């Protein structure tokens, strides 16, 4: 068993935890009672941090919702306020890789908007068009991506049928990519509160999985997040390909 490390200063504790990971002494990093800013500062340190050059830091969560027929992944509810096109592409790659760790060979990724219409008034809907074109050209491999779609159409077949929307995602989404942090975070908290959903989440991008629980997360949610991190470590070949070959 490893010897406990007792450090009172939050910044120093975060730096030491990051150092241990960098030197191979740990496979997973988890935030405890220190502030998120303290940990992120250590993770993002350009010289001694955990984020490889050129990678983005984002958040991916997964929920088991009693009224949905399978696990539902979504991003980003915690880190990137308004993703750029390239950031959205990276978010999708992280989600695809994580889905594979969960045994989902052909993830269905829905690009979420308040409507199914593309409009220059909503620049992210134009990004969605580009992403769908990349997916159709095989850029993401064995994955189905469509959008813009609203949450209901992405997760309920009847909604798409009523609207007359023809999409390979209708009612079958594995992943929801939200347009901004406001919509993602509102979804995250609404579903966990009103639908009694079990949840797990990790930071994506660093060289190891990072469990970043919210202050209001339950013990069970933290447990599930650790389990999700263990799956990601076990699927390190996919993670290494994601970080090093792209």
Regions found by a protein language model. Name each.
Residues 1-169, 174-246:
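Anion-binding alpha/beta catalytic cores of soluble intermediary-metabolism enzymes, centered on
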